[in-house]
Curated annotation (Swiss-Prot):
The keyword Ligase is assigned to this record: no
Protein name per Swiss-Prot or TrEMBL: Tail tip protein L
Entry's localization field: Virion; Host cytoplasm
Binding site for [4Fe-4S] cluster: 173, 182, 205, 212
Cofactor: [4Fe-4S] cluster
Domain note: The C-terminus coordinates an iron-sulfur cluster.
Entry keywords, A to Z: 4Fe-4S, Host cytoplasm, Iron, Iron-sulfur, Late protein, Metal-binding, Viral genome ejection through host cell envelope, Viral long flexible tail ejection system, Viral penetration into host cytoplasm, Viral release from host cell, Viral tail assembly, Viral tail protein, Virion, Virus entry into host cell
Gene Ontology, cellular component aspect: host cell cytoplasm; virus tail
Gene designation: L
Length: 232
């Protein structure tokens, strides 16, 4: 369970957000390997992206299917990485196709990256502004001379736990406004700051329980209100 920092939530609602950077940690220590840190891009200095003092080496890597799902079976994302010089082939042969390894996905707004990434530094650098999700490598679905693809599963699927397979937030709804999980399809009510409006172009959800109350839709709130009580 992770609380998303308020500064990151504020960045989500800005009209002009900074770029979202996805950082990947592939931890193969449980299957006899090492930890690898990759990013699909470089910083503005043409160097590896640095986050929390750690460098993430530029390497072709792409994830898909990480959208939140509140219905049916758990999400099964796919991670595709370059098989440059046969690196993945060698590891897959030595470590049972990497099954059982851990994949950590970090999303960070460029606004909060370490100052060392920028020519003129960064006064907004904040190592706590990240959103993390953890996954297990369930199977190697494709392996060629060009790339390798892996199907991921949530740790709860492999350890027998029964928590929902998504980030659990107490006061923030993670559903897409007016999407299937949200279920609201009525007229315009309020903007993202819960200010009343009848303009459909300004109608946005605040992602808070108050937004659901405005729309008489509390039953579909996508947060976990009881989590706050667990630490009391």
């Amino acid at each position: 369970m992770q609380d998303i920092r308020q500064e990151t939530l504020n960045e989500c609602t800005r009209a002009e957000q900074s770029a979202s950077v996805v950082l990947w940690e592939i931890d193969l220590t449980e299957v006899g390997g090492e930890r690898y840190f990759f990013c699909n891009e470089q910083n503005e200095k043409g160097e590896p992206v640095t986050w929390q003092g750690r460098q993430y080496q530029p390497y072709p890597i792409q994830g898909s299917g990480f959208e939140l799902n509140g219905k049916g079976t758990s999400t099964r994302p796919t991670l595709t990485v370059s098989n440059l010089y046969g690196m993945v082939t060698g590891m897959a042969e030595d470590m049972q196709s990497l099954v059982g390894g851990t994949v950590v996905r970090r999303k960070v707004y460029a606004r909060f990256l370490d100052a060392v990434n920028f020519v003129n530094g960064n006064s907004y650098a904040d190592p706590e502004q990240e959103v993390i999700s953890r996954w297990r490598i369930e199977q190697c679905s494709e392996l060629s001379a060009v790339s390798a693809s892996f199907v991921l599963s949530t740790p709860t699927e492999t350890d027998g736990a029964v928590f929902p397979g998504r980030i659990m937030l107490a006061n923030t709804c993670t559903w897409t406004y007016r999407g299937d999980e949200c279920g609201y399809s009525g007229p315009a009510v309020a903007d993202e700051y819960d200010q009343p409006t009848s303009d459909i172009t300004k109608d946005k959800c605040s992602k808070c329980l108050s937004g659901c109350k405005f729309r008489n839709n509390v039953g579909n709130f996508g947060g976990f209100l009881s989590i706050n009580k667990l630490s009391q």
